[in-house]
């Protein structure tokens, strides 16, 4: 049997975001509960959000490895330019019916870019001069440098030269 062990880290950022762009995905080959050493394993991508590399940056070709004394084999996954889930399939070389797929590996969008930021208000020039507490809604749209929506929970800070505004808020994806 082939079993998925881990993806470390479970989240990497899109290429060029200036943060971690590589994860190691590990599988284990077992005979019952005993680990099998020196077994050839072939890795392939089954879900690729765009540009993800297997074994090296940008390569989508299958990669082979041999299990160690613990029955484990691993492969490096490199982020591409699009965010989304990634799945790696590990199969026993010579018997494609014995396989497992990775879980919980994600390529996340990068930090926001000023180039892809917009700010809008529900009401311009509110009656704030002689009326206290007149509200308006501010909407901020953010994307990373490739135009991908930023992750939920990205914090936006506000300042005001006149009047009052909440000091910060966290993003929430709205379709």
Tell where the protein language model's regions lie, with residue ranges:
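The feature marks long extracellular or luminal low-complexity segments
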Residues: 1-175
């Amino acid at each position: 049997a082939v079993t998925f062990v881990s993806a470390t880290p479970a989240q990497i950022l899109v290429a060029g975001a200036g943060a971690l762009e590589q994860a190691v995905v590990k599988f284990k080959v077992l005979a019952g509960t005993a680990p099998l050493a020196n077994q050839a394993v072939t890795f392939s991508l089954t879900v690729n959000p765009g540009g993800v590399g297997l074994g090296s940056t940008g390569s989508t070709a299958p990669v082979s490895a041999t299990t160690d004394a613990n029955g484990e084999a691993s492969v490096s996954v490199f982020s591409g330019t699009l965010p989304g889930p990634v799945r790696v399939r590990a199969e026993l070389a010579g018997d494609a019916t014995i396989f497992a797929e990775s879980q919980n590996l994600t390529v996340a969008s990068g930090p926001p870019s000023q180039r892809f930021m917009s700010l809008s208000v529900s009401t311009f020039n509110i009656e704030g001069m002689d009326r206290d507490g007149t509200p308006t809604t501010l909407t901020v749209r953010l994307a990373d440098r490739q135009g991908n929506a930023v992750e939920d929970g990205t914090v936006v800070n506000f300042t005001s030269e006149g009047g009052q505004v909440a000091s910060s808020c966290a993003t929430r994806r709205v379709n």
